[in-house]
């Protein structure tokens, strides 16, 4: 136990050194989040498939309740109930940068050094052409349900339910419930509830009002999360713990063309169509998954009907809703329909990442629309 505490003190020291210009202390989060007696109660899991090289190295690390897939190297790190997925790691000989077409000299590896990842989803698919053989997370602390998607990170703090998507981040603080996909950032502090998407052809920026963030996913003085979305997720956690405790689970009824991960929760009258993907960590209850749909990691689809060819990206939550054909629901979106007040999204729509829809009356989003931000009534659809 003392060695674990010393390890976390070292991690705090490393991350704080990277963030010293912001006078930010990651120890406030770690000291209040980590319950050391629980770190010895959960196993670590390593997935083995015929498609991924078996290579798992760890040293001076705690990885309680976490799941790994693909080539991974973990050193001087604490990884708690996190999902480290290397299913899109590149292989030796692959070409990453078409403008500089040099093949990889060895298989890409996820490298995690001097970091603490707390209930974090890490998904490979790095776009960092400077380190093609390594998908790196160094000197970084990530909070509850943060999402690191295809992004290399060094010296950062990621707030609860934040998403870093397809970029490189250096010495940055990302506030809770923020989504950033903007190439590369150095030494920036991103406020809570910021949606920032930018490339050569497109720029989108939005910021939630503080009252909205406080209601759905605020944090206290020690950066511990609270709010409606956090309570919604934590209420479902016991269902996942059962998946890791029980060996012989009842089979899920699904066509042979569909894939349902063993570590997904499937409850109630859930129906799965052809060519459907249900990823690890997904939660389905009384859900209809139309042909060609998917529920990615950490998604929740409850009392909802997905017509078909639907994508629900990492962390998306769909409750009491109907989603039209070929509609995309982005990262960490929260579509909170009610009984008698359903959310209906027409076909061909895009629900932008980190969108919140929470209305006490039924809402209808027309076909082929893009929606974003906070939608609490029909009038909000005019501006969002």
Language model features: what each stretch is:
Residues 40-64, 68-69, 73-78, 83, ...:
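Extracellular beta-rich repeat passengers
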Residues 62, 73, 81, 136, ...:
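Ordered hydrophobic segments in well-structured contexts
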Residues 51-56, 239-268:
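Right-handed parallel beta-helix
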Residues 38-39, 44-45, 49-50, 55, ...:
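Short, flexible segments with low predicted structural confidence
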Residues 32-40, 69-74, 113, 259-262, ...:
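Short low-complexity stretches enriched in small and charged residues
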Residues 1-2:
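Sequence/structural signature of beta-propeller modules
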Residues 5-29, 33-34, 83-137, 141-144, ...:
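Glycine-rich hexapeptide-repeat left-handed beta-helix
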Residues 255-292, 296:
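Beta-propeller domains
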């Amino acid at each position: 136990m003392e060695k674990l505490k010393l390890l976390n003190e070292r991690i705090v020291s490393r991350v704080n050194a990277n963030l010293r210009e912001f006078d930010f202390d990651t120890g406030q989060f770690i000291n209040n989040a980590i319950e050391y007696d629980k770190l010895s109660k959960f196993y670590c899991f390593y997935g083995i498939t015929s498609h991924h090289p078996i290579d798992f190295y760890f040293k001076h690390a705690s990885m309680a309740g976490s799941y790994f897939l693909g080539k991974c190297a973990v050193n001087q790190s604490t990884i708690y109930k996190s999902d480290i997925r290397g299913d899109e790691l590149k292989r030796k000989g692959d070409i990453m940068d078409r403008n500089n077409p040099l093949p990889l000299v060895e298989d890409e590896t996820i490298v995690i050094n001097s970091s603490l990842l707390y209930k974090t989803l890490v998904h490979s698919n790095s776009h960092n052409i400077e380190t093609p053989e390594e998908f790196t997370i160094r000197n970084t602390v990530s909070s509850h349900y943060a999402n690191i998607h295809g992004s290399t990170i060094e010296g950062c703090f990621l707030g609860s339910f934040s998403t870093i998507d397809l970029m490189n981040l250096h010495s940055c603080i990302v506030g809770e419930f923020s989504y950033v996909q903007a190439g590369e950032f150095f030494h920036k502090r991103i406020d809570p509830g910021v949606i920032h998407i930018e490339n050569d052809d497109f720029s989108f920026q939005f910021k939630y009002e503080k009252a909205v963030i406080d209601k759905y996913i605020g944090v206290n003085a020690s950066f511990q999360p609270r709010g409606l979305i956090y309570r919604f997720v934590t209420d479902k956690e016991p269902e996942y713990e059962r998946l890791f405790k029980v060996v012989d689970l009842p089979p899920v009824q699904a066509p042979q063309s569909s894939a349902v991960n063993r570590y997904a929760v499937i409850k109630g009258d859930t129906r799965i169509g052809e060519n459907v993907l249900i990823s690890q960590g997904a939660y389905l209850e009384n859900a209809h998954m139309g042909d060609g749909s998917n529920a990615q990691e950490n998604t929740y689809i409850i009392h909802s009907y997905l017509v078909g060819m639907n994508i629900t990206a990492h962390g998306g939550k769909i409750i009491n809703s109907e989603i039209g054909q070929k509609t995309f629901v982005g990262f960490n979106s929260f579509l909170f329909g009610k009984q008698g007040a359903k959310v209906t999204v027409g076909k061909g729509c895009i629900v932008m990442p980190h969108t919140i829809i929470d209305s006490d009356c039924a809402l209808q989003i027309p076909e082929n629309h893009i929606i974003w931000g906070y939608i609490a009534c029909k009038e909000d659809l005019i501006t969002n």
